[in-house]
Amino acid sequence: MSLRHAVVHAAFLATAVYIATMIPLSAEPTFAQQNGDKAFHALVTDAKDMQTDLKNVVFYWEEKVSDTSFIPHELKHLPVKRGTATVNIKFDGVKQVEVTAASEKTPPTLHITLTSGKTGDFPLAIDGSFKGDSDFGQVDLPVHGLKKLEFK
């Protein structure tokens, strides 16, 4: 009886420890979403002068792992080049982005106006697109096909 009691007790303790460690882990993502996820809203003009009102804007790109596998990335900043450095300009500080198209092998140049009024010209560091929600559904606008993006 004593051995059986010890086995049941050990199983109970193992279950309690497992539950105690899993509850905080399952609550963490919800906490992070409540604190840091700001939704961005922008008016986007494409190369054909079509304007789209986008909500929940993200910069989207796919990292190629193999010929058939990709890792999707949704960012709330713009990865641009400044010399040899990659600079991540947060959407929070951006007022407007004007896109100057380049050749097929050269990334487009972004003329970025910050909310502070400062401006700069930067080549895009990673080929990607702006994704968001419009009144008609989800929209994916490649950066090389854009003219302007104005954050609201």
Give the positions of each predicted feature.
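Compositionally biased alpha-helical segments
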Residues: 28-152
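Bacterial N-terminal signal peptides
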Residues: 10-24
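N-terminal secretory signal peptides that target proteins for export/translocation
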Residues: 1-6
